Every structure is written in C-alpha cells, then in structure tokens.
Amino acid sequence: MKDNKNTENRMSHTRRLVTAALFAALCFGMTMVSVPLPVVGYGNLGDCFVLLSGWLLGPLWGAAAAGLGTALADVALGYGLYAPATFVIKALMAVVAYYIGLTLAGRSVHMGRRVLAHVVAAVCGEIIMIGGYFAYESVLYDVTAAAGSLVGNSVQALAGIVLSAVLITVIRSSKVLTRLFPKL
C-alpha cells in the first residue's frame, strides 16, 4: 500500500512539473508574439498565460512557469537586461492572481462570481506588472522613459485581463480539463 502511495505522489509531482513546463512554454511563446513600444521594451500577449499559470498551477508552480517562460522570452528577444526583473514581476503576478482569485471566488459555483473574482485578480496582477516595470525602468533609465512605457504596458495589461478571463471561463466549463486541473 505504501509503495502505491509513493508512486501516486511521484506521478502527481511529475504531472505538475510537466504541466508547469507546458505553461512556461506557453508564456514564452505568447511573449514572443510582441510589438516593440515607441519608448522602451515591447508589448505582448504573454500576460494572459502568466495569469492562467497562477490560477491553474498554484502559487509555486505558477510563479515558476510564469517567471521562467517570460524571462527566457526577454533573452530571446534581445531584452536580456529586463530578464531578472521580468522573472520577479511575472512570478509575483502569478502568485497575486492565485491568492486574490482564490480568496474572492472561494468554492463558489456561481459562474458570475468566479469570473468577477478572476477579473479582479487579473487587474491586481497587472497593477504589479505596470508598477514593477515602471520602478525598474525608472532605475534603469529615468522616470521620463519609464512614464513613456506606461501606456504600452497598460494596453498589454488590458489584453491580458480580457484574454485570461475568457480562457479561464472556457477552461472551467471544459469537462476534459477539469481532470488535469482538479482544483477548478
């Protein structure tokens, strides 16, 4: 009986690791779909999967997937100087989105309440992204350059909020995916 339990734990750990790697790849891929911003940096669709990583994988695995996938995309896109900040900012986004979403939605079965909880959680996560990059760019460049990226980061945040809210709603209603993500 004990060997069976150990095998289940190893399989569960392996499944989480593989799922986190998949989400890191999704974060990487969607971050690579980027548009250079006029002042500094670039806008992308990676925030959608950063938020989904937090909601679906939990704070530890979600933060690891979000931080690693997006930081590697920074390096691949030639923004290696941003990679350390991106790792921290996106990991924090995933953690905050997880805890706020969990706190607000709880075990509610009411779809409207769950969607609202995820939207509020996404907004809080995106505030961390906007504030985090503003602070980093203020130190790296100056406040004027950092202020110039606020509009682009805000548009990126809005896209991340909308896309992640739509996708989490679709995922929650999918019977197939509830086996992969039993906490839904």
Name these PLM-found stretches.
Residues M1-L184:
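Loop-helix junctions at membrane interfaces
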